[in-house]
């Protein structure tokens, strides 16, 4: 699988992910870009799960953003509804983290749209719990920037999770 983590701190939101694509117990690719910008660079997205499924969801989410003039929550809810109810989409296995300058969300195929705790940290994928734990500890105990926290959290997850590597893609937005 993978690790995607998002941290919002001091006027910045950062989403980062590793680059490993696995098929069973085999590493197929080590430098995949699982974090992207959508909607003219105003929205950051990262996926965990099937690569082909994620690209389908990226395209669909971008259409929802265009339809709702970039309103992140409305677009996420509409994507989650369609993902849950459409027969073809329901088979897609992936999770998304999406973020703009003001909010961050997780979108799942079960129709869930999850907002973060007060700490504004989100993580998904096989190494998500490791990255989430690391990010929370770093936010609480350091003055590191959001980007530095994402970098360190991905490194920790990559050191622990066999489905997460140390090749990272990181995108950020500032308020």
UniProtKB/Swiss-Prot annotation:
Belongs to the peptidase T1B family. HslV subfamily. CDD domains: protease_HslV. SUPFAM superfamilies: N-terminal nucleophile aminohydrolases (Ntn hydrolases). The active site is at 2. Na(+) binds at residues 158, 161, 164. InterPro entries: ATP-dep_Prtase_HsIV_su (IPR022281), Ntn_hydrolases_N (IPR029055), Proteasome_sua/b (IPR001353), Proteasome_suB-type (IPR023333). It comes from Histophilus somni (strain 129Pt) (Haemophilus somnus). It is an enzyme of class 3 (hydrolase). One of its GO terms (molecular function) is metal ion binding. Disulfide bonds: none annotated. Keywords: Allosteric enzyme, Cytoplasm, Hydrolase, Metal-binding, Protease, Sodium, Stress response, Threonine protease. HAMAP family: HslV (MF_00248). This is ATP-dependent protease subunit HslV. GO terms for biological process: proteolysis involved in protein catabolic process. The keyword Cell membrane does not apply. The lineage of its organism: Bacteria, Pseudomonadati, Pseudomonadota, Gammaproteobacteria, Pasteurellales. Allosterically activated by HslU binding. Protease subunit of a proteasome-like degradation complex believed to be a general protein degrading machinery.
């Amino acid at each position: 699988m993978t690790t995607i983590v998002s941290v919002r701190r001091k006027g910045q939101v950062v989403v980062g992910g590793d680059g490993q694509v696995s098929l069973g117990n085999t590493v197929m690719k080590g430098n995949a870009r699982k974090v992207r910008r959508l909607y003219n660079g105003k929205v950051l997205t990262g996926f965990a799960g099937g690569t082909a499924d994620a690209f389908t969801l990226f395209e669909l989410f971008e259409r929802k953003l265009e339809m709702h003039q970039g309103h992140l929550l409305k677009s996420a809810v509409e994507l989650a509804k369609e993902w849950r109810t459409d027969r073809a989409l329901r088979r897609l296995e992936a999770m998304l983290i999406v973020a703009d300058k003001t909010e961050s969300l997780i979108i799942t195929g079960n129709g869930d749209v999850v907002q973060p705790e007060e700490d504004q940290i989100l993580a998904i994928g096989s190494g998500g719990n490791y990255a989430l734990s690391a990010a929370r500890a770093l936010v609480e105990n350091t003055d590191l920037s959001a980007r530095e926290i994402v970098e360190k959290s991905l490194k920790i997850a990559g050191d622990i999770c066999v489905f997460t590597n140390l090749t990272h893609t990181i995108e950020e937005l500032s308020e």
